[in-house]
Structure formats: C-alpha cells, structure tokens
Amino acid sequence: MAKTEQRFDYVKIGLASPERIIEWGQRTLPNGQVVGEVTKPETINYRTLKPEMDGLFCERIFGPVKDWECHCGKYKRVRHRGIVCERCGVEVTESRVRRHRMGYIKLAAPVTHVWYLKGIPSHIATLLDMPLRDVEQVVYFNAYVVVDPGNAPNLSYKQLLTEDQYLEIEDQMYEEGSELQLPENWAMIGAEAIERLLKDIDLEKEAEQLREEIASARGQKRARLIKRLRVIDNFIATGARPEWMVLRVLPVIPPDLRPMVQLDGGRFATSDLNDLYRRVINRNNRLARLQEIMAPEIIVRNEKRMLQEAVDALIDNGRRGRMVVGANNRPLKSLSDIIEGKQGRFRQNLLGKRVDYSGRSVIVVGPNLRMHQCGLPKEMAIELFQPFVIHKLIKRGIVNNIKAAKKLIQSNDPQVWDVLEDVIDGHPVLLNRAPTLHRLGIQAFEPILVEGRAIQLHPLVCPAFNADFDGDQMAVHVPLSLEAQAEARLLMLATNNILSPATGAPIITPSQDMVLGCYYLTADNPHAPDLGDRYFASLEDALIAYDRGVIGLHSKIWVRYSGPMELGKEEKESEPQIIEEPGGTRLKITNYRRIREDRDGNVISQYIRTTAGRIIFNKTVQDILSA
C-alpha cells in the first residue's frame, strides 16, 4: 500500500461531484478493462465462500481477500506482485488494500442527499428559497414543481402542482386552438426536479441580488435573506455546485470497513451497511430494468421513490420516515450512525485515542501530601516509568540488557524500587479527570510512591478537577521529552494554578474536611473541662502536655505568651481588673489575658487563655508563613 508523505493540517468535509466519486472508485486494468462499479447485490458465494464478482465484496474492484493471491488461484505468492490475473482480473497485491479501495453505484435516477434535505437548517430548501415541506413533497413524488412556466398566465416558477392539476394543464396544452405553449419538461417531479432547479441557480448573480435586497430589508425577512446569502457564499468559496447535493453516483465504502465474518456454526455475521447497500442495488437494478422495458410511469415513479428511501436509509437511517430494521426489529446502523455521537468514529477513534504511558485508577485523599504532589501506586509507577527504569538499571551496570532488566522488574527486586525512586524524582506526571471542561481539568504533579492501588490527590486541588472521593477515577499521563517535562513543571504544576482562568478568583480554597478540621481545632467547647488553674510556661509545654494526655484538645488553659496577638471585640471593650502587688508590680486581669507589669508599666509576663487546639492551629499557620 502506498503511503502518503504529504503533511496536512486539517480534514475538510465537503460536497463531492459525481466525477470525483467515480474517480475514487474507478481503476483501469492493464487489459483496458475499467472496474469500480458495483452492479450486483450479492456478497459472497455461500458454496465456495469467495466474493461474487461485481458484488459488494468483489475482489476485482476492491482487491484480493488473501495476500498475494488472485480470485481464481492462478497467481499465488509475493513474487507475482502487481500482476493482474488475465482470467479473473484481480490484481495480485496485499489484502489490506480492501481497507481503502472504494467502489461506486451509478444510480438509475438521481436522489437527494438526506443530510442536505433534512438537516437543520435544510440547505436545499434554503438555497431554493422554498419551504422544506414543499421540497419534500417534490422529492418524494407527491407534487410536481414548475421549472419553466412558458407563456402560461396562471403558472409561476417553482409553483407546486398536484397530479390532477398537472394533467389538467397537459390536456389544455394539447387542446385544439390552444395558445398555451410549454416546453417538454415544464413541470418535473422527484429529485430530478430539485436537481434541475439547483442547476438553474447562478450563484454569483444570486449573491449580488441578495446583497441589494438585504440593504433595504428589515426584521424576519432580512434574517432569512442573510441565511440564504451565507449558504450561497459558502458554495462560491468552496467551489462546490448546488446540484451536487443531488446524488447521481453513490460511493461504496471499502469492504473491510463493513466486514462479513463466518461464525462457528457456519452462519455469517455481517455489517448493517451491507444490508443497506444491498437494498439500494436491488432497487436501482429493478428501476433500470423497468426503464429499459418502458414500464408505466406510475410504476417507475414508485420505484424511484423507493430508491430515494433506500439511499436515505443508507446515509442516515431514521432521519426521514420509518427506520429500516433488521433481525429482532433492531434498527440498522447507517453511515451517519457510524460517524456521529460519542461512540462514533470521530469522538471514539480519532479524537479520543488510547495513549501509551498512561493509566487510570480510583482517587483517594492524600492529606499528608504537599500541594504539588500526588501519590502514585508503585504497581502503576513501575509500569509507566519502565523504559526509564530499564535505562537506569543498564546504566548503573545492575543488568546488561533489556530482557534481564524486565526479569528483574517482574521479580520485584529491592534494587528496582531504589532506581524507580531515583527516576521519578523531579519527573512530573499529568493527572486528568474527565470531563476536562476547562484547562485546570489536567494538571501536573510530582509523584510520590505509595502502597496500594489508588492514586492519592491533595484535597486542595479537588475544586479545580471538580473531584470528590466517592469513587471518582483519574488518568495519569507521563510527559516523555524534556520539553514536555519543562512545560508541565512551569505551566501545569498545581501550585502555579491557584487562580481560576475564567474568573480570576482563587480556585484553591479550603473546603469540607479542611474547614471542619480548622473549626474543630479552634472551637470553644463549653462542655470541655476548665483547667483554669493550669499554667504553662510556653506553647511547647502545653503541646507536650496535650501529647501526653494531661490536657484535652478543648481544655481551657493559661499559657505564657509574648508574641503578637489580635484582640477580640469583647477583650478590647472589657475593663481589666487591676491588682496591686507588693514590690510595686501590678496584675491586669481580663477574661482572656493576665498581664504583670512593673511600676513603670513595662510588661514582665503575659498569660493568655486558650486551648491546645488553637495552639496547634496557630503553630501550623506560623510555620508555613515563616517557611
């Protein structure tokens, strides 16, 4: 298979001309035979289990089923590469060409593309400036549309006519002495009529006329004109023609993308697309045969409508009319179903691919972590960082080759954990929690090896991830290159993302357990024992007493303290009780402070009334501020 070396920036989905669709699937064999058109609804021969020629799995059109082997078996082996078998016409090549070689079906009558007819808004209806209901009446053979009114006074361009009205005007035209002159196809029905109307549109002229009308239009009419002009401008910009929204050639996707596989019991499982394509081919062939034998118009018209419905079901089953169902009344999966939605080709396979060097696990709280750290399970870390560990093991001379290194890792050798510690030191990892609704949904952390199988997350970063610990899962990704690691450290580290990019307000705010913990530490418990006679020489002494169980967390105690403190409203407003002591000193007593001063008013000592919990809280804050 030829690989393209051409780089591209994006994939654009647009309208394809009938010539382009034929070009996708048509090939000329060395003997001059042109292949590519699928004409038979058969898939495989149930006796030989080989694809039928010119069918939906034809080897001549799509390539051989087996590598380097033609259909009839005349040529086998790679040495016949590129030869086209003169007996069966199959090119001897790799079977994987069946993943990209396309075919096509030439339709016996044009059909509208259901996306452009029934999409919201309907581009065909917008472009023709007709109500969608009227366009549908024409497409599904319920009404005629006037495409050339001739000299008829009571007819106008794009006017809809019922069957009876159409026949009445036809009779008038052929009456003796009638002055009514109408061209042969003055009124048409079905997708042919829509194709004719679309062909008649001069895009440049129409765009110019619309711009003039928009200048003077107001309100609803102006909005409608702008919508129509936008569609026309897009057609002009892309170089597409409006009539391409009506299909004359239908592409057939490669057979390996709609496979047919044999099950154990000899039965076959097949993709729904094959059933939908088979319906189209059967109806198309029947229509071609009816046209050949000059069948009555009513029968031909009914077959054309059925062909239109079959193509609609193939492109987007259920978009219009009843859904086509298969066995067990299950709706068949159309081309649109394959590419749209969460399980579709784009979101599932192209945008959301699974990546190497990644893992996921349940998150649990890690209150002992620093904010820029996360707890990474050893089992996960050894798997994610395995190439780095192997490199380090060889570099240190612990092992000589990769195989020996892998064996050492599998045996859980203590040396491996030492090397792993060394490897992850300073190597950030990315944590992501789905859905990633803003950029803080993925942040970088320094990993700390932990036991168990859960990822430990600092509680402060939970609001950014919108995470909680009721079973949430998070994904881990390892940035490999030095550039990626530097970028993760400088831009994505949790400590660099304290403010919300949306509002500028802090997103790292204490909540839940942290607020409750701070409240519990500093709460004034009226039921706690009042140890008013307990005095401590320093904060450290009080903490030692708490650690030894001498005092409780909320026990009221007096502690000698000379540092800065903020007075509460009650303390500021209360008058101190002053006790004069022998030797000239005096004692000022309030509810929360006891201050001893010398005769000049200098503070000799100060005791404050507090609890062990408040001392712990204050010490923690002071330690962080002075760090």
UniProtKB/Swiss-Prot annotation:
One of its GO terms (cellular component) is DNA-directed RNA polymerase complex. DNA-dependent RNA polymerase catalyzes the transcription of DNA into RNA using the four ribonucleoside triphosphates as substrates. Transmembrane segments: none annotated. One of its GO terms (biological process) is DNA-templated transcription. This is DNA-directed RNA polymerase subunit gamma. In cyanobacteria the RNAP catalytic core is composed of 2 alpha, 1 beta, 1 beta', 1 gamma and 1 omega subunit. When a sigma factor is associated with the core the holoenzyme is formed, which can initiate transcription. It is an enzyme of class 2 (transferase).
